[in-house]
């Protein structure tokens, strides 16, 4: 997999999402449930806005001094007996990981949930050299055995599937014979995955945050699969985006608290794991060898720009859980492993506008995402900045550019504007029915197909205002 998950045009992806009734119902239900639990978790913590401000300051400070903290992290990982590799591109990261796996003659790799490994298409790179990669996060495992179906949500990757679909997938791929009861499905998956953990040669994880002062990585999960992936195989490879770093354990404490409350509405997830280097003498478990792969893949190009705040993201999906656009079209409509508002901001930055120029427009600009973000990323403002860049680079449709140019000329000329307010209502009059325009002409058709368009007022505002002024003069 890579950042881009579909070659279908944006309009086709959206149309498919709108027609998926189950997905829309599932997303709506999940958004309401997560909104309620997040609100309760915020109240329990108290002073939520102050915590948000503190989290924002931590992320901003860290990114402004990221060269220092990455150097400190690297030194401390190596002091603890680990190995560090800085990968400028996805290809470099995959090549390094393949070399490690090949050197161990590994036939099987177990992997915990990691967005950055999906971003760089790590699974495919390992499969190309004959290594079997097993996803151990339950949602990712379901998607993997279902013909590598892409995730539709950052935290709940299989949100778009119902229990009947999961039962059928387990039945077809793994010989499952029981019902669609969620508990039975989960127990079956656990039985399957335990075998994989015990026979794996290498464990690969992501990294929620790396701690620069100690050279540690942290893993935040609810299933415990990341602990097994790091405790049982002899070699552990952690892959992180270069921005996923904190200076000290004190900052980690704050950001993990914000992450858990914002993602799933819990004080903490079931498992918060800190790992420092390989196993030491006397340790009961843990890897004999530890590698940390720090991935750039376009992130350094965002540093120092007006979009730097996008790198503050802690992957909680709070913005996704309140987005009205995501609610209606689902995650696959974005065509990226990063869906929702943060995906609409981040994807064009990492992959360019060529295939993703529509994403900044997949927003109502209601700013619910900005209000929900625990690290105060001004998401709706960044979307507007994207739109400005797209317009400046002349990437908009030719018809749209001509329409905006025509409107600009008309709106900046009092004479043309005044004439337009008389002519346009006259031209639209034949399409008016019961005080509205149910089927607009030309470009308006796309609007009236899905929205209500009131008929133009019979009396222009400027005429109404002049009349009231005259009435006032006579009083």
UniProtKB/Swiss-Prot annotation:
Q: Which residues bind [4Fe-4S] cluster 1?
A: 313, 316, 319, 373
Q: Which domain of life is it from?
A: Bacteria
Biological process (GO), any one: lactate metabolic process
Q: Name one Pfam family in it.
A: LutB_C
Q: Which UniProt keywords apply?
A: 4Fe-4S, Electron transport, Iron, Iron-sulfur, Metal-binding, Repeat, Transport
Question: By its UniProt entry, which InterPro entries does this protein fall under?
Answer: 4Fe4S_Fe-S-bd, 4Fe4S_Fe_S_CS, FTHF_cligase-like_sf, Helical_ferredxn, LUD_dom, LutB, LutB/LldF, LutB_C
Residues that, per the record, bind [4Fe-4S] cluster 2? 323, 366, 369
This entry's Gene Ontology molecular function terms read: 4 iron, 4 sulfur cluster binding; metal ion binding
> By its UniProt entry, which PROSITE patterns does this protein fall under?
4FE4S_FER_1
Please report the stretch or stretches of sequence annotated as the 4Fe-4S ferredoxin-type domain: 304-334, 353-382
* Primary role: Is involved in L-lactate degradation and allows cells to grow with lactate as the sole carbon source. Has probably a role as an electron transporter during oxidation of L-lactate.
Family annotation (HAMAP family) = LutB (MF_02103)
Q: Which family does it belong to?
A: Belongs to the LutB/YkgF family.
- Protein's name in the database: Lactate utilization protein B
Instruction: Give the organism's phylogenetic lineage.
Output: Bacteria, Bacillati, Bacillota, Bacilli, Bacillales
- Report which gene this protein is encoded by: lutB
